[in-house]
């Protein structure tokens, strides 16, 4: 079958043509218009026949693949220094195909799949004439082709600036690149295999130096700073990049689609589909997933519930640039998914192995192979993309980006979130076992993305907070239902709970196994529609039986159950436990982060990490105010309501938490003996926290006020916006009616409230809304009281006068 993308048949290829070894550019980039004889022409077979002479490269395109879709994936082999992309990362991806033109030329088109219709439908003709695919290149056939093939010259196609095989215009602008320099650009090699052809090209671009201005760059002290400046371009006036383009033949018959369902979190692709029987255009959305198929003799076994091995398992290779001590943990992070695939009916469906460095027929850039690429980057992150067939969602391969500095990220998370309960976290450099464990969980998370899974930020909300402290329960069940959440580590656990790493680390868990079952269990239905109706019933049954399988989305829709970095079903309770641990950690930071000759850089970094963690807790709690629960459901579930307001008592508890932990000065963050080794203005960190919460995008957001107003119209028991604003101002301005002195922190809080409220009232987004009206009335009430306020403290008196004037000036505009 054409699916066998992982086969390792011998490559047919070679290096640069004679006279162009290694990185040596051609002596002459011009192409003669005369037809040259090519007695020295050499030829190799593969997906395309590939021929070369001293000057040019040729493809021989077999007639049987004309019209067949080919996925062209371009990656950096090596990139210029000083940019945020690295060798191995994807540059571009396009579906292309060859076809014969009426004038005899061979055309290369890009297939822009946005609309479709079956060819046996009358409407197919209308779809075809309204979806002309762009011609990327036109080739005059060359002489000497084998029978049943067309020979074309492809030198300029790859050495030039053909976008589908290179950087797009936006990326070039971000690098400030100009035109390709033909005299310093050349094809390094072309290798051809049975179902793919690999082209490696060195390209040199002219450089358009940015104008001096704000931003980073090589200006140096006192010198001009250049925004988006590329060091090589600034120093040499040109930028050289090496690309590899994999041209992979896609299956002639696309894999059967599995239609997208918002109740299970998968990445999806789609297009608009037309048919003769329609009365409205159908939007087809289908998930991205690998093709796993049983051998014919195993199909009945699988239908009976027996585990079977797929014809072609999912294999990830570990980049040989990966430090040896981390390779076993990256491999384990992949292999941990095997249990999930067993729930879907497969055994030995997925595994990882080290890259066979002694195999000359394998390339890290080859799109037949999935690789965890190790990137020498200061970026503290990792990511898991996939390359898929846009017709069906079939994942072809993935190159996971693993940044070297991700270890800094997991170190800081673990010390801040688990340092109070795990002594292993209390040092700068972790031992290999602990760091390996942390790498393993990140590996599993990123592999999940490459299997098609989206983040499930709601999974952690399915665990009651108190169970996070129950040693037996949490060590057996885990602190979050999904590795695809940003749940990190169990920061709720207290030292006296004696919870081990089994209850502290995330793991592949119930939701992940369910999601893999949904994506990968064969149903053997003939059509995507029949398959979808089957899964609709299964989803309803499973979620009713086990609410822990809920997919909560990716934290972007104002549902406080689905947030990043949170734990448990009660943000207030979880955050209170988290703060208790932060108070234990913050005093120990210097002792845990001792490094000879360090100028407090390590201490400063970890102190800032504690502040950031506290900021997350404030965000988790404030999201409940004006939030709503979102429950996706189908028509067969009439007892479920999609949008529900957060209960009033939960919102009021959230506001009380903010009053106790933010509106009142959190002195524990600054009352540490080393604070003046870090800053001469400790309260500035606290002011930043205030700015994040008391803002036009958080507590005073017009969308939040309007949601409260809308829900109050239909549910009198819900939290009314006027009640909310009264509660909020009563907390923020509690001194106003009592004549008490106001300290500097509280004065800042009050000024911030007024500034944010004025910003909202004056915004166009708030115009004509009830939220603006209520906030305007609140400001007027504050102004009236501030103008009459009395205080024996001169600073407080001046403060109230300034508040009254600020509001008055704003209202007069």
Task: Give the ranges of each region predicted by the language model.
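Bacterial N-terminal signal peptides
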Residues: 1-8
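Boundary at the C-terminal end of the N-terminal hydrophobic targeting segment
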Residues: 9-13
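The catalytic-center signature of Zn2+-dependent metalloproteases
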Residues: 18-27, 354-375, 437-494
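Extended catalytic-interface subdomain
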Residues: 383, 388, 394-402, 443-451, ...
């Amino acid at each position: 079958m054409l699916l066998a993308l992982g086969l390792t048949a011998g490559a047919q290829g070679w290096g640069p043509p004679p006279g162009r070894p290694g990185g040596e550019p051609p002596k002459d980039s011009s192409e003669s218009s005369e037809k040259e004889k090519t007695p020295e022409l050499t030829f190799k077979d593969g997906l395309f026949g590939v021929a070369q002479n001293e000057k040019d490269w040729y493809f021989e395109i077999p007639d049987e693949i004309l019209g067949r879709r080919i996925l062209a994936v371009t990656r950096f082999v090596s990139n210029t220094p000083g940019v945020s992309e690295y060798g191995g990362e994807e540059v571009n991806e396009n579906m292309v195909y060859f076809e014969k033109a009426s004038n005899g030329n061979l055309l290369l088109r890009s297939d822009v799949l946005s609309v479709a219709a079956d060819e046996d439908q009358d409407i197919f003709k209308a779809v075809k004439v309204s979806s002309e695919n762009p011609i990327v290149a036109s080739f005059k056939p060359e002489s000497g082709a084998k029978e049943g093939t067309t020979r074309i010259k492809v030198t300029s196609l790859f050495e030039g600036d053909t976008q589908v095989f290179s950087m797009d215009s936006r990326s070039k602008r971000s690098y400030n690149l100009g035109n390709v320099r033909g005299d310093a650009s050349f094809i390094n090699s072309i290798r051809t295999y049975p179902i793919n052809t690999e082209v490696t090209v060195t390209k040199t671009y002219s450089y358009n130096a940015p104008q001096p201005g704000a931003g980073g760059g090589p200006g140096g002290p006192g010198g001009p700073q250049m925004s988006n400046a590329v060091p090589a371009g600034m120093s040499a006036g040109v930028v050289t990049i090496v690309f590899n383009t994999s041209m992979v033949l896609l299956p002639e018959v696309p894999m059967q689609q599995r239609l997208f369902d918002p109740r299970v979190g998968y990445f999806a692709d789609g297009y608009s589909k037309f048919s003769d029987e329609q009365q409205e255009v159908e939007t087809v959305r289908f998930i991205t997933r690998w093709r796993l198929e049983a051998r014919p003799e195993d199909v009945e076994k699988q239908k009976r519930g027996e585990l079977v091995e797929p014809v072609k398992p999912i294999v990830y290779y570990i980049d040989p640039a990966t430090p040896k001590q981390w390779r076993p943990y990256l491999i384990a992070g992949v292999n941990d998914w095997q249990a999930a695939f067993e729930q879907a009916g497969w055994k030995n469906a997925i595994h990882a192995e080290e890259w066979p460095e002694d195999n000359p027929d394998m390339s890290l850039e080859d799109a037949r192979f999935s690789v965890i690429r190790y990137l020498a980057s200061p970026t503290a992150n990792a990511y898991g993309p996939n390359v898929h067939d846009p017709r069906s969602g079939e994942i072809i391969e993935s190159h996971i980006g693993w940044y070297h500095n991700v270890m800094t990220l997991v170190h800081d998370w673990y010390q801040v979130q688990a340092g109070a309960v795990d002594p292993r976290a209390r040092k700068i450099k972790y031992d290999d076992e602990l760091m390996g464990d942390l790498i393993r969980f990140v590996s599993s998370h990123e592999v999940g993305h490459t299997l098609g899974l989206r983040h499930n930020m709601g999974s952690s909300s399915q665990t009651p907070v108190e169970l996070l402290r129950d040693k037996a329960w949490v060590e057996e069940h885990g602190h979050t239902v999904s590795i695809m959440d940003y749940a990190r580590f169990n920061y709720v656990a207290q030292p006296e709970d004696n919870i081990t790493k089994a209850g502290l680390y995330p793991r592949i868990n119930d939701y992940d196994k369910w999601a893999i079952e949904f994506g990968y269990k064969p149903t053997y239905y003939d059509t995507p529609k029949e398959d979808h109706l089957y899964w609709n019933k299964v989803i309803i049954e499973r979620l009713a039986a086990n609410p822990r399988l809920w997919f909560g989305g990716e934290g972007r829709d104002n549902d406080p159950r689905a947030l990043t970095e949170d734990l448990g079903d009660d943000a207030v309770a979880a955050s209170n436990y988290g703060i208790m641990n932060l108070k234990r950690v913050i005093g120990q930071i210097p002792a845990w982060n001792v490094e000879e000759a360090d100028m407090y850089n390590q201490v400063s970094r970890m102190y800032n990490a504690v502040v950031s963690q506290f900021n997350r807790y404030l965000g988790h709690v404030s999201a409940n105010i004006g939030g709503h629960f979102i429950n996706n459901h189908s028509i067969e579930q009439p007892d479920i309501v999609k949008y529900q307001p957060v209960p009033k008592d939960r919102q009021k508890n959230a506001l009380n938490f903010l009053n106790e932990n933010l509106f009142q000065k959190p002195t524990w963050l600054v009352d540490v003996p080393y604070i003046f080794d870090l800053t001469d203005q400790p309260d500035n960190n606290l002011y930043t926290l205030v700015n994040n919460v008391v803002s036009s995008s958080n507590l005073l957001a017009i969308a939040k006020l309007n949601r409260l107003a809308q829900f109050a119209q239909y549910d009198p028991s819900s939290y009314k916006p006027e009640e909310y604003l009264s509660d909020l101002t009563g907390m923020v301005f509690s001194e106003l009616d009592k004549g008490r002195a106001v300290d500097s922190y509280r004065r800042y809080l009050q000024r911030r409230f007024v500034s944010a409220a004025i910003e909202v009232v004056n915004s166009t987004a708030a115009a004509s809304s009830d939220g603006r009206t209520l906030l305007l009335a609140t400001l007027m009430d504050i102004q009236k009281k501030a103008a009459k306020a009395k205080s024996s403290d001169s600073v407080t008196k001046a403060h109230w006068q300034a508040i009254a004037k600020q509001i008055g000036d704003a209202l007069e505009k």
